[in-house]
Amino acid sequence: PYFEESFAKAYIEYNPKEANRLLDEMGLKKGPDGYRLRPDGKRLEILLEYEDNLETPKGKTTEMAVHYWDAIGIKVTPKVISSSLKSQRTSANLIQFGLWHADRAGFLFTTEPYYWVPIEVRSEALWCVEWGRWFASGGKAGEEPPAEIKKVRENWEKMKSAMDEKERVRLGKEILKSNAENLWTIGTVGLAPHPVVVKNNLRNVPEKGLWGWDLRRFTSYAPETFFFKQK
């Protein structure tokens, strides 16, 4: 109920010419190798660390992103790391650039909106490590977020206890609108097909469905009723 087409289409135009113009305007000049330079004269390089688990094809997504950034002179180096190392580096706020599939904007929006609202320090919520630490510690640690992020958090607090469904949906849309407008995270692919392999004689499995953490994968499709048809 929180989806708006404008959220999905925000900043999706592929326009390398405009991207180059904006980077030039920022003063990020290109060096002799074609890559852009930082203000100190060194090459601008970004380390993209991610956990290539089975939930989404992060490797393929990363390849495309690296290619697009390279085309405008930004050097991005992808690196696959383990889940445990990712957690350690996230907690220490050492990850420059990360990647994770975004969900929890459905049934779990009011309880686990980790990719849209700073809640705490989590290895999946790479976009708001120090803001999450600030909220979780009551302002004793981390970095105090800007007013817009405080408003996002405030809307979520109201959303959690909203008894009126229309008000809850309105608040949820305000949160997602802030993300779409401010690009707290950079979206890549939305609603991509997710094939599921099913053995020929397994029955009661739906041909089509929704796949995501919000639905606990196929839990909502009553897997307890699946059965193998005997010959």
Which sequence ranges carry the predicted segments?
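Immediate post-signal peptide segment of exported/extracytoplasmic ligand-binding proteins
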Residues: E13-L47
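Short, well-ordered beta-strand elements within core beta-sheets of diverse protein domains
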Residues: Y11, P78, E157-S161
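Short helix-initiation/N-cap motifs at beta->coil->alpha
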Residues: P78-Q88
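Detector for C-terminal structural segments
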Residues: P1-E5, K17-N20, T56-V66, K86-K231
